[in-house]
Amino acid sequence: MEMDKRIYLELRNRTPSDVKELVLDNCKSIEGKIEGLTDEFEELEFLSTINVGLTSISNLPKLNKLKKLELSENRISGDLEVLAEKCPNLKHLNLSGNKIKDLSTIEPLKKLENLKSLDLFNCEVTNLNAYRENVFKLLPQVMYLDGYDRDNKEAPDSDVEGYVEDDDEEDEDEEEYDEYAQLVEDEEEEDEEEEGEEEDVSGEEEEDEEGYNDGEVDDEEDEEEAGEEEGSQKRKREPDDEGEEDD
């Protein structure tokens, strides 16, 4: 799927300014450039374009609130100076698996004053002598390179993940979840009540039918008893009648 079409689907009837996270992994970029993404995505904090065939990010729109950018598994070899201009608040940048060969290519990242984490796995630059020491020297604001700090201590999960929602947003999500859960619970209770009422009604109908059937049986028994009484009375009268004839 082409990138601009993917963005349209990801919007899900929202406006670009409502979107804080946008994942475009594995879609197709025509001519190796970002397409369909505009500066209308002014609230965007997380953008992922993994394996989309990018060769350049020169047309990246202005994204002032972007905190984390995933650009791994592409064919980017330069143009990184655009990041400081378009994404001044970027904290986490993943360039793993791109065509970055030397330190001069990443030197423009010095202007990203808030850059905290940088990943360059599977880039040729990692084969240089004293690669880690030189990157930390070139980019003193960076705390974690390829998931480890200057002392080779692994970054905490929160720093590796990079994108963490604010507490207020988490509270809002929890409130929405609680409201939804309560709504589902109320609906289940209503369904149970309706089922109980249906069972009561069906039980009353069964009792009525049983009562009706019992009534029919009682009527039949009464008729049989009446018939037996008539038969016995006839038998009693017959001998009397014979006696009268003899007289």
Swiss-Prot record:
Effect of deleting the gene: Mice are viable and fertile. They have no derangements in any of the major organ systems, including the nervous systems. Moreover, bone marrow cells from mutant mice only show mild decrease of colony-forming unit(CFU)-myeloid.
Biased composition (Acidic residues): 157-230
Residue stretches making up the LRRCT domain: 123-161
Domain of life: Eukaryota
Stretches the record annotates as Disordered: 150-247
PROSITE patterns named in the record: LRR (PS51450)
A single Gene Ontology CC term: nuclear matrix
Intracellular or extracellular location(s): Nucleus; Cytoplasm; Endoplasmic reticulum
Tissue: Predominantly expressed in the cerebellum. Expressed also in cortex, lung, skeletal muscle, gastrointestinal tract, spleen, liver and heart.
Annotated positions of the Phosphoserine modification: S17, S158, S202
Alphabetized InterPro entries for the sequence: AN32, Leu-rich_rpt, LRR_dom_sf
Described function: Multifunctional protein that is involved in the regulation of many processes including tumor suppression, apoptosis, cell cycle progression or transcription. Promotes apoptosis by favouring the activation of caspase-9/CASP9 and allowing apoptosome formation. In addition, plays a role in the modulation of histone acetylation and transcription as part of the INHAT (inhibitor of histone acetyltransferases) complex. Inhibits the histone-acetyltranferase activity of EP300/CREBBP (CREB-binding protein) and EP300/CREBBP-associated factor by histone masking.
Assembly information from the UniProt record: Component of the SET complex, composed of at least ANP32A, APEX1, HMGB2, NME1, SET and TREX1. Directly interacts with SET. Interacts with ATXN1/SCA1. Interacts with MAP1B. Interacts with ELAVL1. Part of the INHAT (inhibitor of histone acetyltransferases) complex. Interacts with E4F1.
Family: Belongs to the ANP32 family.
Protein name as catalogued: Acidic leucine-rich nuclear phosphoprotein 32 family member A
Native source organism of the sequence: Mus musculus
